[in-house]
A protein has these predicted regions:
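Conserved, surface-exposed functional patches that form binding/active-site neighborhoods
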Residues: 102-104, 110-183
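Hydrophobic/aromatic beta-strand patches that form the interior of the parallel beta-sheet core
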Residues: 4-6, 34-36, 63, 104-106, ...
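C-terminal and late-domain segments of enzyme folds
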Residues: 150-234
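Helix-loop-strand module that forms the ligand-binding subsite of alpha/beta enzymes
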Residues: 51-134
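A short beta-strand-loop structural module common to alpha/beta enzyme folds
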Residues: 30-43
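Structural motif
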Residues: 42-50, 157-159
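Generic recognition of short, well-ordered alpha-helical segments
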Residues: 16-20, 47, 75-79
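N-terminal beta1-alpha1 ligand-phosphate binding loop
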Residues: 1-31
């Protein structure tokens, strides 16, 4: 699976969250991920429509990555949509070039997650506020993926940022990023790769083996719990 990450940010080089996400992609991930920063590619705002459409056709998952300004995207990403997602390409007669692909969002958000719910400062959920993107996916025949929302990156601890790094890599590369089992398998594969790279350091190998065993034991417990629940409903 190939993923195209379309980044829109008026000052991407000065953005702490965007630079963290860009640097979070390991060499292993970059083989299947294309980063495409719009403002750096088109500083004059003139979109190469044919090039953009070819990029879309050559990837399976399309990600819009941007700061969530006024419940929408920065202006260049909206302009990109107007120019690139044209009739006869993305919709309409023979406009099926995006059909079967996936559309996801990576949103950097300045407020706390609790504010995006009934009773919160914003009063609406992220799911409600991103309905226009869900509509784009529906109109173009793409499958919409639940957004990866990053709340208050500047206040995240080092541990929280490490968790974000893993979620981000999984969101871009896993076939089912919302499913628990593929996420577990991804972590186990990454740990085994780390063990191979640190071969010869017995202490590190032991810790990694213990973590893998713990994950697999938890999975077995979850499978047993699901079995009991299924039997109860029968």
């Amino acid at each position: 699976m190939k993923t195209l990450v379309i980044i829109s940010h008026p000052s991407v080089d000065e953005s702490g969250s965007q630079q963290f996400l860009i640097q979070a992609l390991s060499d292993r991930s970059l083989e299947q991920v294309t980063l495409h920063p719009l403002e750096k590619t088109y500083p004059d705002g003139v979109i190469d429509v044919k090039h953009e459409q070819e990029l879309l056709k050559s990837h399976d998952r399309i990600i819009f990555q941007f700061p969530f300004y006024w419940y929408s995207s920065p202006p260049l990403l909206k302009h990109w949509q107007d120019e690139v997602l044209t009739e006869h390409f993305a919709f309409g007669y023979r406009g099926n070039k995006l059909e079967g692909k996936e559309l996801g969002l990576v949103l950097s958000i300045g407020l706390a997650e609790k504010e995006y719910q009934t009773g919160g400062q914003e009063g609406y959920s992220i799911s409600e506020l991103t309905k226009p993107f869900q509509a784009v996916a529906r109109k173009t025949g793409m499958t919409y993926i639940k957004p990866l929302s990053i709340f208050q990156y500047a206040y995240m601890s080092e541990e929280e940022r490490m968790g974000l790094l893993i979620r981000y890599q999984q969101y871009l590369t896993l076939k089912k990023p919302d499913s628990l089992k593929p996420r577990e398998e991804w972590v186990i594969a990454a740990l085994k790769e780390t063990a191979t790279e640190t071969l010869g350091t017995d202490h590190s190998d032991f810790i990694i083996e213990q973590v893998i065993e713990h994950i697999e034991d938890n999975r077995m417990e979850l499978d047993e719990l699901r079995m009991h629940i299924d039997n109860y409903h029968e």
